[in-house]
């Protein structure tokens, strides 16, 4: 992977085909049009600790675990969605997924207006893709299941603190040492190490974006 640093500082980032969204350590929200090589971030009103976007909407949660969404191009305004989540994923095909402060798992069919259904299991972080949803638990064990919530959780070998399933053909993740791994979908645990260090990452198409331990921003390609 050829990494390019993007100007700016973010603690969490999400990528879509046309936009990057992120939040900084002060929970301020920023938007940049892809590919964002120049780092021309626009601050968006509001305060969020985590964001995730699909082609149409960006979703996020604030320090009180309140849930918000708005159009991915930054138009309109934040709309509150009922429920409480510490982490939300909008990238899953047909479903919003999230986990709450007790690591309980929820899904909601798009366009979600708060009709959450609890899904069995416990995960601390989750990310949806085209056919599967991927997540990690408090022990950094890795799981996947069909993105519509059918079937059951299947453990994938390996250990990650954060995973992204939104890439086209690969799953990406980072471990407790901020080492970066990739695995060809649907991924049964054949992880290969990527150069670099990231604490959080997200993927769109064949592009991966992420932030490191000092909130520097990077993208592949």
Curated annotation (Swiss-Prot):
Tissue expression summary: Hemocytes.
Example of a GO MF term: metal ion binding
Tagged with keyword Cytoplasm: no
Keyword Disulfide bond: yes
Sequence repeats: 1-38, 39-75, 76-113, 114-150, 151-188, 189-221
Span list, region 6 X approximate tandem repeats: 1-221
GO biological process: defense response to bacterium
Main location: cytoplasm
Cellular localization per UniProt: Cytoplasmic vesicle, Secretory vesicle
SMART domains: TECPR (SM00706)
Disulfide bridge partners, by residue number: 32-36, 108-112, 183-187
InterPro entries named in the record: Beta-propeller_rpt_TECPR, Tectonin_beta-propeller
Keywords: Antibiotic, Antimicrobial, Calcium, Cytoplasmic vesicle, Disulfide bond, Lectin, Metal-binding, Repeat, Zinc
Family: Belongs to the tectonin family.
Protein name: Lectin L6
Organism: Tachypleus tridentatus
Taxonomic classification: Eukaryota, Metazoa, Ecdysozoa, Arthropoda, Chelicerata
């Amino acid at each position: 992977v050829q990494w390019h640093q993007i100007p700016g500082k973010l603690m969490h980032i999400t990528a879509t085909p046309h936009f990057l969204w992120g939040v900084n350590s002060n929970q301020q929200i920023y938007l940049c049009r892809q590919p964002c090589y120049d780092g021309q971030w626009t601050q968006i009103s509001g305060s969020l600790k985590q964001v995730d976007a699909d082609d149409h909407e960006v979703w996020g949660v604030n320090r009180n675990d309140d849930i918000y969404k708005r159009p991915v191009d930054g138009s309109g305004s934040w709309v509150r969605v009922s429920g409480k989540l510490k982490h939300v994923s909008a990238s899953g095909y047909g479903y919003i997924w999230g986990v709450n402060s007790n690591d309980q798992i929820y899904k909601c069919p798009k366009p979600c207006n708060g009709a959450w259904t609890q899904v069995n299991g416990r995960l601390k972080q989750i990310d949806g893709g085209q056919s599967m949803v991927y997540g990690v638990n408090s022990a950094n064990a890795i799981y996947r299941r069909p993105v519509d919530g059918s079937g059951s959780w299947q453990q994938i070998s390996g250990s990650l603190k954060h995973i992204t399933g939104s890439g086209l053909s690969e799953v990406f993740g980072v471990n407790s040492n901020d080492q970066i791994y990739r695995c060809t979908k649907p991924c049964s645990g054949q992880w290969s190490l990527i150069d670099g260090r990231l604490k959080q990452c997200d993927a769109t198409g064949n592009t991966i974006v992420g932030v490191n331990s000092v909130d520097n921003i990077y993208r592949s390609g």
